[in-house]
Structures are given as structure tokens and as C-alpha cells.
Amino acid sequence: KGNSGPGGGGTIPNLTFADVSVPEGNGGTGTVEIVLTLDHASSKPVTVNYSTVDGTAKAGADYTAVNGQLLTFQANETEKRIQITVVADDIREADETFMVRISNPVNVNLLKETCVVTLKNDDTKIGFANTGYDAPTSYPGYTLAWSDEFNGTSLSATDWSYESGDGCPGLCGWGNNELEYYTAPPNNLIFQDGKMIIEARAEAFGGKSYTSARIKTQGKRTFKYGRIDIRAILPTTKSLWPALWLLPQSNVYGNWPTSGEIDMMEEVGSEPAKVLGTAHYGPGPGSTFISRNYSLSGATFNDQFHVFSLEWQQDQIKWYVDNNLYSTVSKADVGSNIWPFNEQFFLIVNLAVGGNLPGAPDASSLFPQWLILDYIRVYQ
């Protein structure tokens, strides 16, 4: 596109520029520079206007907006530079983009109209709102039996172990067609500000396109009855599948699902205002289950912390969000099937990518994503 009129040598010059990628920085402001070049000089002034347009980067928060700014090449000038102010922060996030749109060409042809500016994230700190519901530190009739407040710089080897890989060869895709490779420390497990953070990334590793982490207390901490409180912030993007769940320490009644599975909390990342609580049981080979959900109104589980709880006693399990009861499952509900939940279980925390429940990532999926735990407390 261009404006008719003679240039140097009787031809109108072409305006060219390249997309730009710059480090965002971790404090204050910086500058991104876009070089605009004419393929030959013009005997007349050349003018264009330029404006910024939001992408995933937002004006005010990530850069300073420009609207309709005039840029002039004087006669025989062939290069000009546009400078846009970039607002830096120290928060780890996905790379972000905005556009600089060129318009109203006079005495010049535009070979393209838009420059894409990519702000490459180079930060290490993960941002989150340290607000939300906080559970009581005591309950009538219960005493604190075990807790992990995640105040250290690494996972307690006394309480936890890692599961790594993709489940192969015995349980490829972890039995759910998941797409991630779970790494051993320190790749995807981060400790910051008294929180444990599992980071899911879009990166090639172990033959997979995504990495994340999965930890368990198997053989180290087992639980039977009581109340479990877990305070967490959940991720929000299509294909993410965070889970807080329990499996039996011993398969007393046979292989899964006959010996049971208790899902304290599962979330489908594309539905960030809803969580699921589920009891899986036999007779197999597929699961028979009772599942119910809890939804927030006008908010998501990514906005701030919420507390996911189980109240577990002989022949009955109750599920809570922020101490609001939303599901009760009792022995009578499983009918003639075995009630497998009067045994010792261990805890698993993981952040899956893809799988049967959330589906695969698509163009709307943003990485990295985080499952952030403040504490786990077990009362008996």
C-alpha cells in the first residue's frame, strides 16, 4: 500500500522493517527500537503515522502506548527509528507481544503494516496474590498430626518423593493420556515466599513437549481418617489439570480402582471457576465413581488462595472449599461394591498437561502455568 507521487529516480520507495524481540528486564523502564528503512532515497519528504496495539502485552502495564504519532523522512533520508518505552517487572510470566501499526503513508509504499514486538521474559519471581481464604489452625476434637508449611528451599525428603518420567513403560501417559514429562528436582518445583510451586512449561524434554512435577508421600506419610486442609492457587489455561489426591498405600482389595482413589480436588484449566471432588471405587476394570463440583461466582481459583479440604471418617468422606461443604459420600452410596476407604492412603500433588479430562493444549493455551501451595495440614 502506498501514496502515489514521484520519489527519487521517479519511483516511490518501499518502507521495510522487521519484527523485534527484546528482553523485558526486571525493573524500571527500558526501550524497544524499531528501525524503518526506505529501499532508496526520495526527493520528497516521506511520512507515516504509527500507533501501538495491545496483544498479550497491555499498554500501561507492559509498555507506554503511542497513538497516531507522525514520522517524517526528510528528502534523501533513508532510515528512521521508532522508540517505545517498555515497563519492566520482576515477575516470571510467558513472553508477551504487542504491535506497532504503520498507517497513512505519503510518498512511500508499505510492504507490510504491522511490526510485532515480543517482550522476552527474563524474570525468576512468580507473581501471585497472597490473599484469600485461610483455614483455622485448630478444629474441635482434632489435633494437628502432620503439616508441611513449605517454608524451606526444597522438598522434605522425610515426607516426599518425586515421580518422574511419562509413566512408561508400565503406565504410559500416567493412565490418562497425559502429555507432560515429570522432572526430578530442581527443574519444575520452585520454593518462593513460603510457597511450593509446580511449574508446567511448554518445552521439549524426554520425548514430550511439556514438563511439570508430581510428588507423593507414598511409603513416608500415610493417612487414615481426619481432616486434610490444602491452601492453593490453581492455574488457568486450556489443557491444565492440577490434582490433589490420595491412593491406597496397599491395594487391600485388588488393583485400581477396587482399592479406591480419593480426589480431594481436580480442576480443568479451561474452567477455572470450578473444581471437582471424586471418590473412585470398584469393581473394575474401569472406574465406578461419585463426583461432584463446586463453583465460584464472579471469580476463579486463580485469583487468590482457596482451601480445599477433606473430612474423612469411617464409612464417610466430605469435601469442602473454604469450609463450605459441597459433597458427602457414604458407604451406603456405593451399594454392593466394596467401600475401600477405611484403609491407609498416601497423598499425591501434581500438575498434568493434557489428558482425558482437560484435553490437549491449543492456540489459546499459555505457558508457563503454576500450581501454588501454601500449606498442607492433617488433623486427626
Which stretches of residues belong to each language-model region?
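Intrinsically disordered, low-complexity segments used for protein-protein interactions
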Residues: K1-G2, L240
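Short boundary segments that mark the start of a structured unit
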Residues: G2, G8-G127
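Small/flexible residues
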Residues: N3, I82-Q83, A94, S103, ...
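GH16 jelly-roll
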Residues: N109, N121-Q380
